[in-house]
């Protein structure tokens, strides 16, 4: 019931949210060290 709907919600959420955090953390790391 709810178990069937959870994967269809979490898969795209994780798929979009995890790369967004990775890009944000990388951007902040570059800005903090002033590599660019």
From Swiss-Prot:
Metal-binding as UniProt keyword: no
Role, per record: May help in the organization of the PsaL subunit.
Organism this protein belongs to: Amborella trichopoda
Entries under NCBIfam families matching the protein: PS_I_psaI
SUPFAM superfamilies (alphabetical): Subunit VIII of photosystem I reaction centre, PsaI
Segments traversing the membrane: 6-28
Protein name, per record: Photosystem I reaction center subunit VIII
GO cellular component: chloroplast thylakoid membrane; photosystem I
Keyword vocabulary terms for this entry: Chloroplast, Membrane, Photosynthesis, Photosystem I, Plastid, Thylakoid, Transmembrane, Transmembrane helix
Membrane topology, from the record: Single-pass membrane protein
Lineage: Eukaryota, Viridiplantae, Streptophyta, Embryophyta, Tracheophyta
Family according to the record: Belongs to the PsaI family.
HAMAP family (alphabetical): PSI_PsaI
Predominant localisation class: plastid
Gene: psaI
Biological process per Gene Ontology, one example term: photosynthesis
Subcellular location(s) of the protein: Plastid, Chloroplast thylakoid membrane
